[in-house]
Amino acid sequence: VSDRLIIFTRYPEAGKAKTRLIPALGAEAAAELHRQMTEYTLAQVKRLQQSLSLTVEIWFAGGDRIQMQTWLGSDLSYQPQPEGDLGDRMAQAFQTAFDNGVKAAIIIGTDCPELTDVLLTEAFQALQQTDLVLGPATDGGYYLIGLRRSVPELFKTIAWSTDRVFQQTVDIASNLNLSLATLPALTDVDRPDDLPVWERTITPSSVL
């Protein structure tokens, strides 16, 4: 059974998507940004699939399966996100993957345009030798988490949406004696100050 990449995203409905950017951009533009960032992430994933044997699952919030398929295509697998906090939902996504017999699974969001197919490849390669791989975000969270087996303890007692998420996860992993590989620190585009990261990503650097 191949490796699995799980993408957490939501249907780009105005007022529900990228809410922390609404004061700066307005609800419609924030939802449009979310749509573009999700499509950009999927373009990286499609490049990854050319070199790795991979199943891709979209775990979505908002909208329904038909709306998601119409938006992102029917060649992907869609799963509505369950109830619970982010930790509960990620723990369940990993449990489902390992119940299906996958060897390694990675969860990403769609907020990190600097996450390339090259880094995703590096993360899957790290999981051949390592229990846990994390991609630290500059806001103290993480943009990627990968495992070789279900470890629900990694998602309990975490102060989600704070700058302590990455460090708390590392501490739990250490207590569980899990081996850890970390990727380069990247920026999630969540707040108005982060928007230049997205603009740099989609604007090819001009040759002076």
Identify the residue ranges that each predicted region occupies.
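Conserved alpha/beta core of the MobA/IspD/sugar-nucleotide pyrophosphorylase nucleotidyltransferase superfamily
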Residues: 167-208
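Short, glycine-/small-residue-rich phosphate/pyrophosphate-handling segment
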Residues: 151-172
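A short, N-terminal amphipathic alpha-helix
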Residues: 34-51
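Short beta-strand/loop segment that forms part of the nucleotide-sugar
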Residues: 54-62
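Short aromatic-hydrophobic micro-motifs that form the base-stacking/packing surface
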Residues: 106-108
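Short phosphate-binding loop-to-helix
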Residues: 68-104, 162
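N-terminal nucleotide-binding beta1-loop-alpha1 segment
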Residues: 1-21
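Conserved donor-nucleotide/metal-binding helix-loop-beta segment in metal-dependent transferases, i.e.
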Residues: 115-139
